[in-house]
Amino acid sequence: MPREKQKRGRRAEDKSKKDAAKRKRDEDPEDLTAKRLKPATEAEVDPNNEITEGADYIPFEENREDGPPSDMPFYGLLDSEEQEYFSRANEVLESNQFQDAEERRIFIDSVYREANGKELKVACSQSCSRLMEKLISLSDMRQIRRLFNKFIGNFLHLVQHRFASHCCETLFMNAAPGVTQKTPKAKEHNMEEGEDDEPEPELSLAEMFMKVVEELEGNWGYLLTERFASHTIRVLLLVLAGEPVDLSSTDSVVASRKKERLGIVTSDAKEEKPVAERQPIPESFEATLKKIMRDMVSGLDNTYLRALATHPVGNPVLQVLVYLELSHFGKSSAKDPNSIIRRLIPDDEFDENSEGATFVRGLLYDPVGSRLLETIIRSMPGKLFKGLYKNVIRDRIGSLARNTTAGYVVLRTLERLGKDDLQNAKESITPEIPGLLERSRLVVPKVLIERCLVRGVDTSSLAQALEAAYDKDPVRRLEQILKLDPVPSEEESEEKQKQSGGNQTAAAEKLHSSLLAQTMLTAPGALSGLVYSSLLAQSSDSLLRIAKDPTASRVIQQALTVSTSTSQFRRQFTTRFTGHLTELALDNSGSHVVDALWPATQDLVFIKERMAQELLQDELTLRDSFVGRAVWRNWSMDLYKRRRGEWKAKAKGIDSNNEGQGERPKSRIDLARAKFAAKAAEESKAPVAAKI
């Protein structure tokens, strides 16, 4: 009888133990209270991640004396009736079927009254903490102050809780715009709202934030690497600095994870609290922020501080600290030998065997540490950046661009280079472009083109490299640039949808391909010519397929409206869509292409009239469609039907704001005449100036 095939050795044994432990975790009920991470023993360390000799990593000691007690206080559980009520309230807020803002405000007040005395229970509840986040995001400053006051005295435990920490985050973000407001008198609110007997808190929001700092004081070193508290600490630091807190932005130093946006979509833009712009702060906040930043790192020596750069939880907090130190307190703070940036990088020259050069080289290829290096490069003083670029990055920028992780550091570097250094970097990266395109690493060429346009660097060598990397046939070239698949048969398309229906990797590659093509169109000369010639070579069916593609259609829109688009190209290209306008206008993506045809034919009025007549023939069909009605409105088709003369004036771009007396845009011959007249006027003045 054949024996079962089994793996032998220490790694197989460790793998079986891990699988058993994983099954046990899946079967056990999840503890609702946040637990402190236990330090991994030597037996539990993954053999693939063993700490080799000389590695720039030192594990943090979890059993620190300054850490808070490990037992989490229990605030109680909601009974079944309370859970049912809050679940229904959550559904009502999700549906957002309120007639007006006043009705929604009354409903939120009723939920707050029901939650009175149970706020901590709701915040720590797995099923109801999301409701608390929604309530906070929809609350006014009076309600936020009251809830903030209920949390005071418990923040040390709440920020470490798996669910309550999110509520603290949302509370800090929404309370930030009110830190400079004065405390309203309690009598005034009692007069306004007779039904509400709850007393107003005596503390202002600024004073409440200071209370939070007092509660957390002495535990900063531990909270720095606490898996739940670290997120809240980052938000708190940015609020104290008055910096924008925008979790949805990819460039935000606080957005290191995917965050659900739990706010309710409203039609009134005034109801949304602005958190994406700098906020005014009290004077006391700045001194408090300096003290917090000093206390956070004072207990760590330089070795541990550098090890924090590769810590998955501590690294984002360190990013915020470095960002605030360099941008908020001025780059002159980098000269202080006790500053964070100086403790990480003690020297300016980055010599071969210096501590700073060794530290930076260790971060270049680290998936976690490279994010800190991006923040440092973006914010560091110019003198320090020049030394870093000259001694660490310049000679190896081509090989760094090939790497998946170090490539992002290269992007931040390109953004800071001057014209001469950018020219040299372009020459080093250009030979790597075929390999980057083959592996779909398209961000580096895209950013390189953008920076060359900003600095005025010649892009002809980039155009040659891109042309050599793609097919010589212009039709095939566009398919390669945009990652367009050949048209499959019906059976093949059904099988492909079943197999790769949600392939996010392919969608991301198509997005970056489209962005690269759009960037190429902004560059005058050969770079944009590669895309323009490929678009003109496409058949009508192929253009329709591209126009209906949500990602690729952006390239057509860009080609029709960008400044490098010539009148000759638009005259040839726009006529390719005649006869298919209604089909495109009824498509979600194609309708945007039809909208782009309006500005593209501003100097081609005869083509625009032909297109308008085609749309008019299918008026009923367009009016029955949501996107069709948008196209009808954007093309001013009602004006075309009733007042054809006014429509023609609008089609030519004549501004008729001043009582119908508009100014016609100057044609090419008018511009040439004006230029010749100005030159003649200068020549006539020249002899007079010489005599004087």
From Swiss-Prot:
Pfam families: PUF_NOP9. Disulfide bonds: none annotated. It is found in: Nucleus, Nucleolus. InterPro entries: ARM-like, ARM-type_fold, NOP9, Pumilio_RNA-bd_rpt. Residues 1-10 have a biased composition (Basic residues). Residues 11-27 have a biased composition (Basic and acidic residues). Signal peptide: none annotated. PANTHER family: NUCLEOLAR PROTEIN 9. This is Nucleolar protein 9. The lineage of its organism: Eukaryota, Fungi, Dikarya, Ascomycota, Pezizomycotina.
